């Protein structure tokens, strides 16, 4: 708790429960898990393009990156999210200045699910990226970088 000066959490919530159906797809390395995560990770605008970088396809780039993951990596990631139960207690122990960067249209970790987490940090600031989904660093990388620099 005392070794860190600044903490930034991007696209977070508590709890981060993951559905059994998605966990089962990921456990069996079913491509459907990647399809669901890709779809749910982006805002509606990002799903149909809207990339600030011409020629880049956000959703397909994300899908391809996940397809390159080693076996069970996605499952273990989702399981860790789902099994993490001490988030509020851990937040109370943080003495560092904390910044949460949340997406307005985040379907995986909706901003209203961060409310209890926010209330348990001692020194917290929240930045919301309008129109962005869970993939904040892909959908709006420059604004995320600006917020990270502010936090330092």
Give, region by region, the residue ranges found by the protein language model.
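Core-facing hydrophobic residues within beta-strands of well-ordered domains
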Residues: 3-5, 124, 132
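Conserved alpha/beta-hydrolase catalytic His-Asp/Glu region
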Residues: 15-18, 24-93
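Hydrophobic "lid"/C-terminal helical patch
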Residues: 78, 117, 144, 148, ...
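Conserved alpha/beta-hydrolase "acid-adjacent" motif
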Residues: 107-113
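Conserved hydrolase catalytic core segment
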Residues: 1-17
């Amino acid at each position: 708790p005392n070794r860190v000066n600044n903490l930034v959490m991007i696209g977070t919530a508590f709890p981060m429960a993951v559905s059994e159906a998605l966990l089962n797809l990921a456990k069996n390395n079913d491509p459907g898990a990647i399809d669901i995560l890709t779809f749910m990770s982006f805002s509606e605008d990002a799903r149909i393009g809207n990339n600030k970088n011409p020629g880049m396809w956000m959703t397909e780039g994300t899908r391809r990156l996940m397809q390159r993951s080693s076996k069970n990596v996605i499952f273990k990631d989702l399981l860790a999210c789902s099994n993490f139960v001490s988030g509020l207690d851990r937040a109370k122990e943080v003495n560092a200045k904390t910044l949460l960067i949340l997406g307005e249209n985040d379907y995986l970790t909706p901003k209203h699910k961060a409310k209890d987490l926010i209330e348990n940090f001692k020194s917290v600031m929240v930045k919301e990226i309008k129109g962005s989904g869970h993939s904040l660093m892909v959908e709006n990388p420059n604004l995320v970088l600006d917020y990270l620099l502010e936090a330092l």
